[in-house]
UniProtKB/Swiss-Prot annotation:
Subunit structure: Monomer.
Function, as annotated: Transfers a GMP moiety from GTP to Mo-molybdopterin (Mo-MPT) cofactor (Moco or molybdenum cofactor) to form Mo-molybdopterin guanine dinucleotide (Mo-MGD) cofactor.
UniProt xrefs under NCBIfam families: molyb_mobA
Protein name, per record: Molybdenum cofactor guanylyltransferase
Protein's gene: mobA
Binding residues for Mg(2+): 108
A Pfam family it matches: NTP_transf_3
Length: 203
């Protein structure tokens, strides 16, 4: 009789999660988006409130106002001086997080669902390098879970000047996590108008 051995499901406690707050926020007039107030709290605090019950290890990727972010969680910064978008934060997270699996979310999504980490963990396969959320219509490339074995490939990718996150996903064993029943999880706030509207709709 041949038996197949299944790998145990990755546990949320065996993951670290990084909140990406290192962008330039040009559509927010250059303001540091994670520190913008929403209903009396900085945006990054809303994200922490959603993630903290799901995972024991949280980090913040920030490239300015690090001392302010340090009040919320340990801060890591990009190693690349040209700030290569979210891949710079992902590179920093993979370099500094204590676990083999490292997840990433943006700092401007206050409606992250309560089982986001569990869904990612349950979707991990033996061959997985990267997992990316999918809302049923589109992939959500900055809601993602990476294994640290991707770090050398990511370093080479950035060193040759590539900056498009989706191109990296095409080069790795990437699979997608179904969030078609929870598309609001990925709602993000990009402009002052969206921020004001969201605050009014969600007092």
């Amino acid at each position: 009789m041949i038996t197949t051995q299944t790998l145990p499901t990755l546990q949320p406690s065996d993951t670290s999660w990084v909140i990406l707050a290192g962008g330039q926020a040009s559509r927010m007039g250059g303001q540091d988006k994670g520190l913008i107030q929403l209903n009396g709290q900085p945006l990054v605090q809303h994200v922490i409130d959603k993630l903290a019950p799901q995972t024991p290890t949280l980090l913040i990727n920030a490239n300015r106002n690090q001392s302010q972010y340090q009040q919320f969680a340990p801060v890591i910064s990009d190693e690349f001086p040209d700030y290569p978008g979210p891949l710079g934060g992902i590179h920093a997270g993979l370099s500094h997080a204590p676990t083999d699996w490292v997840g990433f979310v943006p700092c401007d999504s206050p409606l992250i669902c309560d089982d986001l980490v569990a869904r990612f963990c349950q979707a991990v396969k033996p061959e997985s390098d990267i997992l990316v959320a999918h809302d049923g219509e589109h992939q959500q490339p900055v809601f993602t879970l990476f294994h640290k074995r991707v770090l050398p490939k990511l370093s080479a990718f950035l060193a040759r000047g590539d900056r498009k996150i989706i191109l990296l996903y095409d080069e790795c064993h990437t699979s997608y996590v179904d969030f078609s029943d929870a598309p609001s999880c990925f709602f993000n706030l990009n402009t002052p108008q969206e921020l004001a509207q969201f605050g009014a709709l969600h007092p």
